[in-house]
From Swiss-Prot:
Protein species of origin: Escherichia coli O139:H28 (strain E24377A / ETEC)
CDD domains: PR_SDR_c
InterPro entries on file: NAD(P)-bd_dom_sf (IPR036291), Sc_DH/Rdtase_CS (IPR020904), SDR_fam (IPR002347)
One Gene Ontology MF term: dihydrofolate reductase activity
Pfam families: adh_short_C2
UniProt record, GO biological process: one-carbon metabolic process
Active site: 152
Keyword NADP annotated: yes
Gene name as annotated: folM
Function description: Catalyzes the reduction of dihydromonapterin to tetrahydromonapterin. Also has lower activity with dihydrofolate.
Stored PROSITE patterns: ADH_SHORT
Keywords recorded for this protein, A-Z: NADP, One-carbon metabolism, Oxidoreductase
Protein name, UniProt field: Dihydromonapterin reductase
Class of this enzyme: oxidoreductase
Length: 240
């Protein structure tokens, strides 16, 4: 009994940045991990060598989403959690077909988690009261909106709403919550002027890094009561 292997945690978009940090966090805790990735970064090889199951996935179509779900269903009899981290970021730019922008944002942020939650539901159930989790990664703009990323904001708002609907559907076996970050970490190519402008948007004036997200994920996974809630990680930006 004491040597029973823990059920894996599924992380979509686990090949870089926050998804990668979460994958390593769980690996270091001897927690099995399944990671989806779109592009094969060198970091994927490191995860594989550390024992993670890494599955290349194309979430740009529903068929691609379901093909990934089938691979997960073949590989495990249960899941400890699903962390919906896969994301894309498109602006309404001159010349960009608006219908395509909206369709792309809805596909990755709405269709993908919606289909995966349904397809993998049976892997989350049957493990006890509040024993499994779904965490959706939304965005600070859900509250505020965005004049330059309207489709992106709308798709993340839909994902935020799905958090409450799936919480109602899956309780009490599965807790469903969302995390709504603003600036967490910079890209390597961000220049000093941009970084300062971005930092000034929050009261805390810092980019906290992946650990802030990891700590919140750990809290949600260990809670036996919290469900159907969105947790902002915005450094007080809503008060600016």
């Amino acid at each position: 009994m004491g040597n029973t292997q823990p059920l894996p945690i599924l992380i979509t978009g686990g090949g870089r940045r926050i998804g990668l940090a979460l994958a390593w966090h769980f690996i270091n805790q001897k927690q099995p991990v399944i990671v989806s990735y779109r592009t094969h970064y060198p970091a994927i090889d490191g995860l594989i060598n550390a024992g993670a199951q890494c599955i290349q996935a194309d979430f740009s179509t529903n068929d691609g989403v379901m093909a990934f779900a089938d691979e997960v269903l073949k590989s495990t009899h249960g899941l400890r959690a699903i962390l919906h981290n896969a994301s894309a970021w498109m602006a309404e730019k001159p010349g960009a077909p608006l219908a395509d922008v909206l369709a792309c944002m809805m596909q990755i942020h709405v269709n993908t988690p919606y289909l995966l939650n349904h397809a993998l539901e049976r892997l989350l159930r049957g493990h006890g009261h509040a024993a499994s989790d779904i965490i959706h990664f939304t965005d600070y703009v859900v509250e505020r909106g965005s004049d330059k990323h309207i489709a992106y904001a709308a798709s993340k708002a839909a994902l935020d709403n799905m958090t409450r609907s799936f919480a109602r559907k899956l309780a009490p076996e599965v807790k469903v919550n969302s995390i709504a970050p603003s600036l967490i970490l910079f890209n390597e190519h961000d220049d000093a002027e941009y970084r300062q402008q971005a930092l000034n948007k929050s009261l805390m004036k810092t980019a906290p890094g992946e650990k802030e997200v990891i700590d919140l994920v750990d809290y949600l996974l260990t809670s036996c009561f919290v469900t159907g809630r969105s947790f902002p990680l915005d450094g007080g930006r809503h008060l600016r």
